[in-house]
Design a protein with these regions (language model features):
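Extended alpha-helical "rod" scaffolds
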Residues: 1-324
C-alpha cells in the first residue's frame, strides 16, 4: 500500500506538470502547481524523518530474527519518501527553466543580449523564484534545489554560448564580463559563503579566451583546458563565432591545442573529476531543448508566460514572498 501511495504521488506531480506545460492556451493552465509541489516536498521530507526515527526506535525492540526485515521495510519506505521529495524539487527547477526558455532564445543575439540585458532579466527571474522557494521550502531541500538550479542555469548559459552563430567583438567580451558579475551576484544570493567564486571560475577563463587576440588566445585556452578538460568542440564553436577571427586563425589555434593535448596527454575529464563543462559537452547542439525538458507551448509562447504567472501568483499570495 505504501509503495502504491508513493507511486501515485510521483505520477500525480508529473501529470500536473505535463498538463500545464503542454496546454495550448493560457486559460487552460490552472494555478496551484508550485504551491502543491512545495507542500508535497516538505511533507515527504518530514515523513522520511519520522520514518528514520521509527527505525531507530523499533530496531532494538523486535526479535533479532525479524530485525533485518523491519529495517528493509522501513528503509524502503524512507527512500520512497525521499524520492518523491527529490522529484518535486526537480519539477520546481523545471518550472524556473520553463519560464526562462524564451529568454535563452535571445541569449548572445543582437540586439537583445548586447543592448537589452537578457542575462539581467534571467538573473532577476531566478532571484525572484529563489526567494520564494527559500521562504517556504525546508532549508535542507532549498540547499539541494538551489545547487541543482544554478548548475543547470550555468550549463544552459554555456550551451547557448556554444550555439552562438556570431559574437560581435569586442562588445561580446565586454557583455560577457558584465554577465559574470550578474551571475556571481545571483549565486551569492542563493548559496552560502564563497561558492560564487568557484562557480564562476570557468566563466572568467572563458572571458579571457574571448578577450584575447587571435595570436594570444591559446594561452588562456590552455589554462581553461587544464582545469576543465580539452573541450575542443566547445572552444572551436566559440572561436568560429568570433567575428574578429577568420578560418585560418581558428584552424591554427585548434592545431596548436591538439598538439599540446597529445604532448601533455591531457585527459578529457580533469583529475579532480567532472566540472560544469562535462554537462555542456554532453549536450549536443541539437538537443539544447533537453536542458529545459520536452516542453511544448501554444502560439507565441503563451503557455510559457501563463505558467510562470500562475506560479508567481500563488507564491505571492498569503505571505509566500519574503517582502509580502
Amino acid at each position: 500500500v505504501m509503495h502504491q501511495t508513493q507511486a501515485t504521488w510521483m505520477r500525480t506531480a508529473q501529470q500536473e506538470f505535463k498538463k500545464q506545460t503542454t496546454a495550448k492556451q493560457p486559460e487552460e493552465v490552472n494555478g496551484g502547481l508550485v504551491e502543491y509541489l512545495i507542500a508535497l516536498a516538505n511533507d515527504q521530507l518530514a515523513s522520511a524523518d519520522q520514518c528514520e526515527q521509527l527505525l531507530h526506535r523499533l530496531v532494538n525492540q523486535v526479535p533479532s530474527e525479524n530485525r533485518g526485515r523491519v529495517r528493509e521495510l522501513l528503509d524502503n519506505a524512507l527512500n520512497g519518501f525521499l524520492d518523491i521529495s527529490k522529484h518535486c524539487l526537480q519539477l520546481l527547477v523545471d518550472i524556473v527553466l520553463f519560464d526562462l526558455r524564451p529568454a535563452f532564445k535571445d541569449m548572445f543575439t543582437f540586439p537583445a543580449w548586447y543592448i537589452e540585458g537578457t542575462t539581467a532579466m534571467i538573473t532577476e527571474t531566478v532571484r525572484d523564484y529563489a526567494g520564494d522557494y527559500a521562504a517556504r521550502l525546508d532549508p535542507n531541500l532549498y540547499d539541494v534545489l538551489s545547487d541543482d538550479l544554478l548548475t543547470r542555469l550555468l550549463a544552459a548559459y554555456l550551451t547557448a554560448l556554444r550555439r552562438s552563430a556570431r559574437l560581435r567583438m569586442p562588445k561580446a567580451a565586454e557583455r560577457f564580463g558584465v554577465d559574470i558579475s550578474e551571475l556571481s551576484n545571483l549565486i551569492s544570493f542563493m548559496r552560502p559563503g564563497d561558492e560564487a567564486t568557484s562557480r564562476v571560475e570557468v566563466l572568467h577563463m572563458i572571458h579571457a579566451i574571448l578577450s584575447s587576440s587571435s595570436s594570444m588566445v591559446f594561452l588562456p585556452y590552455w589554462t581553461f583546458a587544464k582545469a576543465h578538460g580539452p573541450n575542443l568542440a566547445f572552444i572551436e564553436a566559440v572561436l568560429r563565432a568570433r567575428d574578429d577571427m577568420d578560418k585560418n586563425d581558428v584552424t591554427a589555434v585548434l592545431e596548436s591545442a591538439k598538439r599540446k593535448i597529445r604532448q601533455e596527454n591531457l585527459p578529457d575529464v580533469p583529475e579532480g573529476g567532472p566540472t560544469i563543462m562535462s554537462a555542456v559537452s554532453q549536450t549536443q547542439a541539437s538537443a539544447f531543448s533537453n536542458l529545459f525538458s520536452n516542453w511544448h507551448a501554444g502560439p507565441d509562447g503563451d503557455t510559457w508566460s501563463a505558467l510562470a504567472q500562475s506560479a508567481q501568483n500563488y507564491l505571492g499570495a498569503a505571505g509566500w514572498r519574503r517582502d509580502a
